A protein has these predicted regions:
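A short helix-loop-beta-strand connector motif used in the catalytic cores of GNAT acetyltransferases and
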Residues: 45-56, 87
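Conserved beta-strand in the GNAT
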Residues: 56, 62-71, 87, 92
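Conserved GNAT acetyl-CoA-binding A-motif
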Residues: 114-125
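Conserved active-site alpha-helix within GNAT-family acetyltransferase domains
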Residues: 104, 116, 128-146, 151
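Conserved GNAT-fold acetyl-CoA-binding loop/helix
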Residues: 22-43
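Conserved acetyl-CoA binding element of GNAT-fold acetyltransferases
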Residues: 79-95, 125, 147-150
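A short beta-loop-alpha structural element at the N-terminal edge
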Residues: 2-16
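Conserved acetyl-CoA-binding loop-helix of GNAT-fold acetyltransferases
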Residues: 93, 99-112, 139
């Protein structure tokens, strides 16, 4: 297995992986999300963006996982320190390849991407119900930073 930056030629192989991530979200929070395919423009913008990348795990010529990253700059405010951090927007590994170090390799690649750009941190959001993901991130040394509350059925 190797980790590399995606190219436009990878778009078709990436579509089912992004769809798998969206499917997981829809299963965990069906009132908030629905299954869908990620549009090609979004995928290609991540690949070609000046402040973004899609990192892929490839095995035997097939993409088995992805990590979508982009830079976020927090503008200075009297109460806020200006900084740029890496947002890990999506990380997804095909089910057949989970628990084999693929996700950790992608997370490490995202971290290296952020460090190479001198980002202050690597941040992500995950659904509270996604216990597997939360365990994965905590085992990787990440910590919970913010909690979002929601009041539904208004």
């Amino acid at each position: 297995m190797r980790i590399r930056k995606a190219t436009i030629e990878d778009t078709e192989q990436l579509k089912p992986l992004f769809a798998g991530s969206l499917r997981n979200m829809a299963q965990l929070q069906p009132r908030q999300y629905r299954e869908a395919e990620q549009d090609v423009e979004f995928i290609q913008a991540g690949i070609l963006g000046e402040d973004s990348d899609v990192l892929v795990a490839e095995k035997d010529g097939h993409i088995i996982g992805l990590a979508s990253v982009f830079s976020v700059t927090v503008k200075p405010r009297p109460y806020r320190v200006q900084q740029t951090y890496c947002e890990l927007d999506t990380i997804f590994v095909q089910e057949a390849h989970r628990n084999q170090g693929v996700g950790k390799a992608l997370l490490d690649a995202a971290w290296n991407w952020a460090k190479a750009l001198n980002h202050a941190s690597l941040q992500l959001m995950t659904l509270g119900e996604n216990e597997d993901a939360r365990r994965f991130y905590e085992r990787a040394g990440m910590r919970e930073h913010k909690i979002v509350y929601i009041l539904e059925n208004l």
